[in-house]
Regions:
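Hydrophobic targeting segments
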Residues: 2-7, 38-42
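Short, well-formed alpha-helical segments that are part of the catalytic scaffolds
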Residues: 12-32
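Short, charged/polar "capping" segments at the starts of alpha-helices
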Residues: 14-17, 47-52, 127
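Hydrophobic/aromatic residues located in beta-strands of well-ordered beta-sheets
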Residues: 39-40, 86, 116
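Acidic ATP/Mg2+-coordinating residue in the GHKL
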Residues: 43-46, 91
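Active-site-proximal specificity loops/subdomain of glycosyltransferases
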Residues: 45-82
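Short beta-strand-to-loop acidic/aromatic patch adjacent to the donor-nucleotide binding site
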Residues: 83-96
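Conserved catalytic core of nucleotide-sugar-dependent glycosyltransferases
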Residues: 94-218, 227
């Protein structure tokens, strides 16, 4: 059994203005060192510090697509077996109990209809992929949801659907399931400045999040998507800080 963590690197050991916040990094390194079947790859949107480069495999990419782009790009550069268990996680996650690893693996093994597991419940949304997407409300560019998808995945975005969704902060799956949906779709251009002076992190991220939620629901069905808790951004295993990357 092979376990692969894919960590979206942005905050590293500095969080909320405080440096040397290494609890997440230290725990992940300990897991890697103590388990021969567990590997960790950091997919970074800015140059990682030595605490990452000296302990983990990593790749650095331009910050396009936020966490969804980071996950997709690094998977394209890796050669993973179909049966590899995948754990996608942002480095601002507060982990209370690492036993979620075995909980997810046991659930996949006992419930073959389950294809992806998120942390806390996330909001469903009725989406018509041929209508204007969330990001386009801000940009006024008129793009529909399907316009943001990869060319090879556009055929999946055809009809109105109530989609369930997974936040990019954390979700687990298997490599064969991610290949089944053609990897991850995401807004494929950099963050821009919005009229109020902020950047487009939220509309970019929300559009990418629900693009993938639509696709997961379309291919796997709602029965294929599970959560570790029924609370938004929280389970007994993890709390999502929601800061983005």
């Amino acid at each position: 059994m092979k376990i692969q963590f894919i960590v979206c690197g942005w905050w590293y050991d500095e969080w909320d203005g405080k440096k040397n916040q290494t609890e997440f990094i230290d725990a992940l390194y300990e897991l890697k060192e103590e388990n021969d079947n567990l590997d960790v790859m950091w997919t970074c949107h800015k140059t990682p510090p030595k605490i990452i480069t000296e302990k983990f495999d990593y790749k650095e990419y331009e910050n396009i697509g936020l966490e969804w782009g980071a996950y997709d790009k690094v998977l394209n550069d890796m050669d993973l077996d179909d049966n590899t268990f995948l754990f996608f996680i942002q480095d601002d996650m507060v982990v209370h109990d690492w036993s979620f690893i075995n909980v997810c693996i046991d659930h996949f093994n006992l419930n073959p209809t389950t294809k992806v597991i998120g942390n806390g419940w996330n909001y469903p949304w009725d989406i018509n992929p041929l209508e204007e997407a969330r990001l386009s409300y801000w940009l006024k560019n008129g793009y529909n949801w399907r316009d943001y998808a990869k060319e090879e995945n556009k055929h999946l975005y055809e009809e109105p659907l109530q989609c369930w969704s997974m936040r990019g902060s954390f979700f687990a799956s298997k490599m064969k399931y991610i290949r089944e949906v053609g990897g991850f779709d995401y807004v494929n251009f950099p963050l821009i400045e919005m009229p109020d002076g902020s950047d487009s992190r939220d509309p970019n991220g929300n559009t990418s999040e629900y693009l993938n939620g639509y696709k997961f629901t379309k291919v796997f069905g709602q029965q294929g998507m599970k959560y570790l808790s029924d609370q938004y951004r929280f389970s007994k295993y993890m709390t999502e800080c929601g800061a983005g990357s």
